[in-house]
A protein has these predicted regions:
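Hydrophobic transmembrane alpha-helices and immediately adjacent juxtamembrane helices
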Residues: 1-223
Length: 223
């Protein structure tokens, strides 16, 4: 409770750091904040071409199947890899002033979360424009899934950011882990493709039920 109270006392600092991170993401670029929407769209196009056209995944409306999973994965991947360095990236501030070190990973993950929410605007725009449709009842569970993913991403960032202070190579190791983790998660393929003998191990992946939940709500339109 004391930690929560202390974080509440530093809420203005957290909000300020979130705003600073959001403004600084694409500072100096010609398109600026538009990259928030362009980046996931370009990734969607590339993955759709590779897995739907070249590898012939054979999933109906693969672009939507992929998009509703890719955006949450981009958020998690950023927290996994970049969140690890959030304390080291602010080491001068850490040396000069006192504040709960939890503020740094918390503000970084929150910034990434806001960025994901903005990307979801594109998802809903695509759903509306293409007439894909939404199940309003299933949609009520979307905030819960987002909160669970946020909590997981924050927990991992808290651990990795603390460890990276002592083990600098961890950030590079996490980049490799992140790439492998994506392909062990049903982001670009349906979970039904996983052989039964590996399914128990597959389900131990904490991102599997989260990505599956996003897809159930927005693609399959059921709970």
């Amino acid at each position: 409770m004391n930690l929560i109270k202390e974080l509440y006392n530093y809420r203005e600092m957290i909000i300020s750091l979130v705003k600073k991170d959001l403004r600084g993401r694409y500072k100096g670029s010609a398109l600026g904040f538009l990259w928030t929407f362009i980046n996931p769209l370009f990734q969607l196009i590339i993955y759709t071409l590779v897995f739907s056209t070249i590898m012939r995944m054979g999933v109906d409306k693969f672009y939507m199947f992929l998009f509703v999973a890719l955006v949450p994965w981009i958020f998690f991947s950023a927290c996994l890899q970049q969140g690890a360095t959030c304390i080291m990236d602010n080491k001068e501030m850490v040396k000069k002033i006192y504040f709960p070190r939890l503020v740094l990973p918390l503000s970084f993950v929150t910034s990434c979360f806001v960025n994901m929410l903005l990307s979801f605007v594109v998802i809903f725009a695509v759903i509306i424009v293409t007439g894909f449709g939404i199940n309003p009842v299933a949609l009520l569970f979307l905030p819960l899934v987002m909160i669970i993913e946020y909590a997981l991403a924050l927990g991992i960032s808290l651990i990795t950011s603390a460890c990276t202070v002592y083990v600098r190579d961890l950030q590079h190791i996490l980049s490799i882990i992140g790439l492998g983790w994506m392909y062990l998660t049903p982001v670009v393929y349906p979970s039904s493709m996983v052989p039964d003998k590996y399914r128990t191990l597959f389900n131990l992946n904490p991102m599997t039920p989260i990505i599956t939940a996003y897809r159930d709500i927005l693609y399959y339109k059921h709970i």
